[in-house]
Amino acid sequence: MGSTSINNSADLIAYSVSDGGSDWRTWKVMNIDSGEILSDEISWAKFSGATWENDDSGFFYQKYDEPNEELLKDINESPKLMFHKIGTDQSEDIVFYENSEKPRWGWSINVIKDTDIKLLSISEGTDERNRLYIQLNKGEKFIPLIDEFCLLYTSDAADDDAC
């Protein structure tokens, strides 16, 4: 098993599995109370967690295009930040964010509790330094908060009820 992520209602868990120790992950979803594995299955995720939307309708994840067998071990470029709605097929997932002009950049997202605010962390390759962008309302463009790779910035304090 790779990563896990429990939704806000604590009734569903998204978990990733890998095949043979590969970095490629397949995400699955399980009902915590019943133990039922739902039909949701997300393939070709890599270097990604699952971040639930506040309303538990689904989660965000990073994926790459499916490589052909010859390119399976090559450098992966041009990831997409996707949104998967629970109960739908992966082919219906929505591209939430991408930047084809920066093929080595990768994405992770933090959904701020009880708001529409989303923080996008952008990294390049395996470098831990990142950029932070913010989306204040659904459908709006992301605004750069920190637009250079100089330090590792996190958004942990944004979810702290003490703030």
Language-model features, listed with the residues they occupy:
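Single conserved hydrophobic/aromatic residue that forms the stacking wall/gate
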Residues: 153-163
